[in-house]
């Protein structure tokens, strides 16, 4: 067993959350940036929610994360977003048997209170893989709370 650094732990938590969203939606979920797809989601753990040294349960970090969903069709975007909203609680913590807790260092993965209603879909431009011209598509952002612990593996 080797010590897991803070950055390694954060990366593992981000990957576990993205894979969890993929299992729920069955759709492509990328980490940090859109690779040039008009139908996908991008998950990114952003910043400490309550300060630089914020803690939860004494040794875990509470982060605000975001999920950007991209679709060429606005109705398909709304369906994808509603599926995710229905799958995640807003205020409930992960229970002891949660698959994320068993396979990673994530203690809590839930919708942030600010995501009670779906934000308005907006248009954005994407340069699809293999093309040079921009394509307009719809996007919406959902916020998540992620509480994870930097720990030994």
Question: Where are the regions that the model predicts?
Answer:
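Charged, amphipathic alpha-helical segments and their flanking helix caps
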Residues: 1-31, 48-153
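Surface-exposed, low-hydrophobicity interaction/linker segments
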Residues: 34-36
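A short, hydrophobic beta-strand-centered structural micro-motif
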Residues: 38-49
């Amino acid at each position: 067993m080797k010590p897991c650094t803070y950055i390694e732990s954060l990366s593992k938590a981000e990957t576990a959350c993205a894979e969890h969203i993929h299992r729920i939606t069955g759709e492509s979920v990328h980490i940090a940036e859109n690779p040039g797809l008009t139908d996908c989601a991008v998950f990114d753990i952003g910043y400490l929610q309550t300060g630089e040294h914020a803690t939860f349960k004494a040794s875990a970090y509470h982060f605000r994360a975001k999920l950007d969903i991209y679709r060429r069709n606005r109705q398909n975007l709304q369906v994808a977003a509603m599926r995710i909203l229905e799958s995640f609680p807003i205020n409930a913590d992960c229970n002891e048997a949660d698959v994320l807790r068993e396979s990673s260092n994530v203690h809590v993965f839930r919708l942030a209170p600010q995501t009670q209603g779906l934000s308005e879909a907006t248009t954005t431009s994407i340069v699809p893989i293999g093309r040079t011209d921009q394509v307009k598509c719809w996007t919406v952002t959902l916020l998540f709370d992620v509480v994870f612990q930097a720990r030994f593996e």
